[in-house]
Amino acid sequence: MMIKNKKKLLFLCLLVILIATAYISFVTGTIKLSFNDLITKFTTGNNEAVDSIIDLRLPRILIALMVGAMLAVSGALLQAALQNPLAEANIIGVSSGALIMRALCMLFIPQLYFYLPLLSFIGGLIPFLIIILLHSKFRFNAVSMILVGVALFVLLNGVLEILTQNPLMKIPQGLTMKIWSDVYILAVSALLGLILTLLLSPKLNLLNLDDIQARSIGFNIDRYRWLTGLLAVFLASATVAIVGQLAFLGIIVPHVVRKLVGGNYRVLIPFSTVIGAWLLLVADLLGRVIQPPLEIPANAILMIVGGPMLIYLICQSQRNRI
């Protein structure tokens, strides 16, 4: 009971930190706001500075929160579905497939912009299915599966490079220049994906069972692995439709959360949601304040942090095999 209460207290502390970070991000930037500016806005309704920030900065913050949460949860789900601690949507080519589909849709059917998360999901599904089919035939270990994923990532990025030579191919890059319609589109996918994940989370712990153990308790492990994988691909692909590829968030957060609260997915999923949202928000905030008025993309900061962590996890995986 004491451990459970400690986890609840930790979760509440993380929520407070997340809210505080969101506030700092809201008032920090080229146009700075004071607390009095906000009070004036909410009491009189007249403050042009706050109005401009609400239209320019608030959508960016909300999208950072949703994307961070979705990518972190997607990483945790992929690791559960593939039974691979190194799995992440960007590394295994899911994000690249989704981005190619996004580019094609914007060129040929731009009127379906509202459905981009769903259409990107179709693109992200292709590399995921290739990984699954190859794994079922060759039974890759964790590192070999990631190497196949990296090969797919390189291949698909080559295709993407060719496609983007066409100036009509609009590819989203990072969190800048986001508007309220982007928030609404992503919010639908975020709510749907995260709610389904919470409903599925009690079953995720059973994915660690082998086939014989699963059958003995009447658990259809293959069905739930597929459901978990599809949900992970959907969450990652939906973010790609709005902000493009963001690396390593799906690896960093689940492993940090496991160190904090253990591997129980009922606890891991909510914590990953909050920490993922916070981490991307911090990366975006740092990118805005390190070298103003220039902005460093949040993806660059994530890559600097995530690259060494991936190397560490690969070394740890190899050490466990010895």
Swiss-Prot record:
Keywords: Cell membrane, Iron, Membrane, Transmembrane, Transmembrane helix, Transport. Its main location: membrane. GO terms for biological process: siderophore-dependent iron import into cell. It comes from the Bacteria. The keyword Ligase does not apply. One of its GO terms (cellular component) is plasma membrane. The chain crosses the membrane at residues 9-29, 61-81, 89-109, 114-134, 143-163, 179-199, 233-253, 267-287, 294-314. The keyword Transport applies. It is found in: Cell membrane. It is a multi-pass membrane protein. GO terms for molecular function: transmembrane transporter activity. Pfam families: FecCD (PF01032). Induction: Repressed by fur in the presence of iron. Part of the binding-protein-dependent transport system for heme-iron. Responsible for the translocation of the substrate across the membrane. PANTHER family: FERRIC ENTEROBACTIN TRANSPORT SYSTEM PERMEASE PROTEIN (PTHR30472), HEME-IRON TRANSPORT SYSTEM PERMEASE PROTEIN ISDF-RELATED (PTHR30472:SF21). Belongs to the binding-protein-dependent transport system permease family. FecCD subfamily. This is Probable heme-iron transport system permease protein IsdF.
